[in-house]
Amino acid sequence: MSTLIPEFTLPKDFCADAREAYTIPARFYTHQAAFEHEKEQVFATSWICVAHRSELAQPNDYITREIIGENILVVRGRDNVLRAFYNVCPHRGHQLLAGDGRAKNVITCPYHAWAFKLDGELAHARNCENVQNFDKENSHLVPVRVEEYAGFIYVNLDSQAGTVEDQLPGLGAKVREACPQVDDLKLAARFVTRTPANWKNIVDNYLECYHCGPAHPGFADSVQVDRYWHTLHGNWTLQFGYARPSEQSFKFEEGKESSFHGIWLWPCTMFNMPPLEGMMTVIYEFPVDAETTLQHYDIYFTNTDLSDEQLKLIDWYRDVFRPEDLRLVESVQKGLKSRGYRGQGRIMADG
């Protein structure tokens, strides 16, 4: 049980009035003690979005993800059931699989060759028949909660947690409304960065489009930041803006009404539905420590044979749009520790 020291607590009415709101104090973004508390109270108890369903579409498909220092294995069994486990052999603790891919019909530990079925059951342990009182029944992989929800895969380290819908009520319906083809998306590109910034710093940047005009000129040339709304829905939020065709970013038929949807979901995943049909981008955050966050920036299309325009758009995300945000959060993370920063900044509410 993590107990937070007084300097890392806030009053219950903190920022109750948005017109008088400030950011949380800088120390919450920089101090390891705050992060250690978040590991146990946030990330060990919350549903974390880890992938799109297309990455685990076929039997034997698997992915691995690092969540608060725990390597998690998600695999689709030969019976087509999705399961998740701690990616660690119960014998001596060696990691079983790395990266993403297709598993064999048994997962074999590279250390002592213990073999496990895809449902986590121990299939074979060399010499176990000669080991007195060897408990094969209690030598299975340790399971982790996993759910598929509105086209995406979520895991939860808390075996007693409710469902994804319990944590994010109404999110699934909104995702399907904003991107009706969500189930048919396929991964087209992934940009992985080990970002020197606190996970909340990155979330803050996403939640405030106050920076979109000056910091994202290509995005703002399409998505109209003066026709842009942000609504709160408990543990998720929705940003919505009307869009027009742009040669700098999103190209689509002139005269066609289109829009951008941006959804943040607790604690640290961001869904984006650009003003183009059959496309999404997702920012997956995997916090490493108080000032480091591993990020996957994934781009999805419904088609796999990408057009020249889609390839150019991927290049724009990789070379222009994504670096714009990375520079911002990295600079802020440094500035939060400066003697010249007064410890908190104002929230610039619209009114």
Name the predicted role of every residue range:
Residues 1, 26-29, 303:
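Terminal targeting/low-complexity segments that flank the catalytic cores of oxidoreductases
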Residues 3, 75-76, 81, 87, ...:
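C-terminal catalytic domain of Rieske-type non-heme iron oxygenases
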Residues 6-26:
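Short, contiguous pre-domain boundary segments
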Residues 24-67:
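Non-catalytic accessory segments flanking enzyme active sites
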Residues 43-47, 94, 211:
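Generic structural signal for secondary-structure transition and capping sites
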Residues 45-56, 125-129, 264-268:
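Short Pro/Gly-enriched beta-strand edge/turn motifs at strand-loop
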Residues 55-159, 163-173:
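Rieske [2Fe-2S] iron-sulfur-binding domain
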